[in-house]
């Protein structure tokens, strides 16, 4: 387990978590650990129902001692059906209009695939084009108000854009 001292704490009825800001200031790692009494419903909620932006916006200042497992996850997903289910349909039609991008015709999208890889280790985080180093705060903490978050069971994570609070990469670690 990696140990990290953070200052952004997240807690509600379902999750306890933290935000770890990456060097450079553009992105942050957010981890949400389901509370033990909520763990049975965790899989129902996991990614689809987790509003990462709302959690990012709800963070509050606290001294947080975070324990993070080293992990690496790679996934391959076929997203054609998902794209169509959210209304992106015309690009799959043989009559799709791509005239604003090319003069070559006829063009259509046959499938949408995604390969995602995230690796969190002592050197930092690598996810697609996102990388970071761990930074430790350097002031004396108020020991009575320290929050402890140990990611020792399945949890949700996201790499979020700090300006918008929106995830650029998200997933679930279900095996430690």
Feature-to-residue mapping (PLM):
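Secretory/exported precursors with cleavable N-terminal leaders
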Residues: 1-176
